[in-house]
């Protein structure tokens, strides 16, 4: 089911992206005489995308050609989107600048997006460590609690066991007291997840996990089975107390308000210690106040991942990236350590967060 949706989506995006690019370029060069010629460009591109997808399906193997072909194809789509964006920007410029050599313009349209895409492919491989701190009067320890947050790992065709090993190295280097994974640990990889997550066994502190939308494509019992074998504590509609802090996990597919109401009514969300909510998709902290939530840790947005998604996301989400505050309630959004669909990022970084909880004087 999921593979079929991805297949149709890739065909559509591939065809429309490159069709749009070629139509714009040829229109700019005044090579089109009739509208019918524009449609004639789109059709073969869609067919090409269809056959590329068929190749991918028949070579489906995590160790073989599938991963390489998948990465290559979606990288081409990412490049096409960048070309399309730069085409649109350039056409806007030409509306203001009357005299410009068309071949210079074409060189800019083609060359700049390629460099931009190379940058977008490299930058996610350089993981940023972001440190933030929060203080709470009910946190009684003189020693700050160090929480390492991972989000949106997206294990699959692009990110596999070697990537987990890199993450584990980062965890060990930063020496946290506890690790939390706020969703989308898996992409297309649950069947091999146990072996890929094996490096996490080197981490000797608790690892909490709550499911994101990609994790929810699978049966919950299967996700629990794989994570439990990897020393990961699956936390959904429940709490976990550790070193003077109460962690609350709610899966992406659960009714958030109903789940928090039930936990509060059952006496599991008292304000005697800080309550930290692990939630994949970010929520406005204003909506969390009444449940005694001090801090919500989220991901999901990827901070837009590709331009212009960085701008569109700010319309879609109340809290897109970093810290949002309402009174004494906070939401912190991690932009993710992995990425989805396109193995690229622009105007944003792959990130691991170190969150320190301190005593408020």
Predicted regions span which residues?
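Non-catalytic terminal accessory segments
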Residues: 1-125
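N-terminal signal-anchor transmembrane helix
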Residues: 66-70, 96-150, 156-173, 192
């Amino acid at each position: 089911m999921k593979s079929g949706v991805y297949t149709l989506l890739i065909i559509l995006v591939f065809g429309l992206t490159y069709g749009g690019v070629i139509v714009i370029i040829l229109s700019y060069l005044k090579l089109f005489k009739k509208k019918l010629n524009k449609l004639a460009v789109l059709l073969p591109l869609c067919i090409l995308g269809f056959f590329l997808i068929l190749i991918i399906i028949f070579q489906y193997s995590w160790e073989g050609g599938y991963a390489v072909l998948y990465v290559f194809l979606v990288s081409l789509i990412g490049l096409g989107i960048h070309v399309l964006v730069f085409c649109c920007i350039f056409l806007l410029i030409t509306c203001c600048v009357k005299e410009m050599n068309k071949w210079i313009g074409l060189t800019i349209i083609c060359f700049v997006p390629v460099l931009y895409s190379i940058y977008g492919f490299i930058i996610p491989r350089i993981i940023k460590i972001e440190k933030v701190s929060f203080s709470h009067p009910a946190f009684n320890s003189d020693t700050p609690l160090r929480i390492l947050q991972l989000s949106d790992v997206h294990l699959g065709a692009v990110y596999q066991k070697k990537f987990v090993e890199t993450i584990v190295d980062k965890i060990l280097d930063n020496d946290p007291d506890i690790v939390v994974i706020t969703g989308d640990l898996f992409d297309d990889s649950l069947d091999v997840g146990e072996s890929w997550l094996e490096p996490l066994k080197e981490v000797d502190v608790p690892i909490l996990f709550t499911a994101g939308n990609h994790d929810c494509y699978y049966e919950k019992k299967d996700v629990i089975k794989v994570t439990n074998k990897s020393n990961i504590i699956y936390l959904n509609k429940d709490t976990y107390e550790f070193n003077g802090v109460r962690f609350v996990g709610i899966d992406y597919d659960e009714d958030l308000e109903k789940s928090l109401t039930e936990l509060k009514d059952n006496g599991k969300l008292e304000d005697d210690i800080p309550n930290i909510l692990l939630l994949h998709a970010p929520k406005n902290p204003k909506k969390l106040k009444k449940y005694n939530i001090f801090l919500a840790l989220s991901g999901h947005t990827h901070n837009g991942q590709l331009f212009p998604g960085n701008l569109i996301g700010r319309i879609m989400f109340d809290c897109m990236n970093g810290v949002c505050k309402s009174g004494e309630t906070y939401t912190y959004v991690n932009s993710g350590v992995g990425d989805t669909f396109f193995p690229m990022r622009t105007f944003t970084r792959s990130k691991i967060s170190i969150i320190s909880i301190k005593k408020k004087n």
